[in-house]
């Protein structure tokens, strides 16, 4: 089963004070060698979130290194860039950020489920008939 993985789910795996059944489900899928696909911005969002976590002392630099090593072992692929108009239309229709709409557009384009902890993005996915992981 291939699915779109968003940054909110991925970052949940990094911080011990964040727990989510959806994140656990997505992690379990990846542990079974299932594949996730992400928009290019995911790479930056993850690294920014972890950098802030280190700065705020939520994790150490050593824990950061371990987290990135674990991520690199998972079958997570970066998708080709989308058509701007498709992402913009979703952002406008559902009042999402362009970033969040990129995850939704990718799930639509690939015709696969989306793993997200973002409530607005999840509502938009439901409205667009995009299945959600763990829902």
Where do the model's predicted regions map?
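Acidic catalytic patch
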Residues: 40-43, 63-94
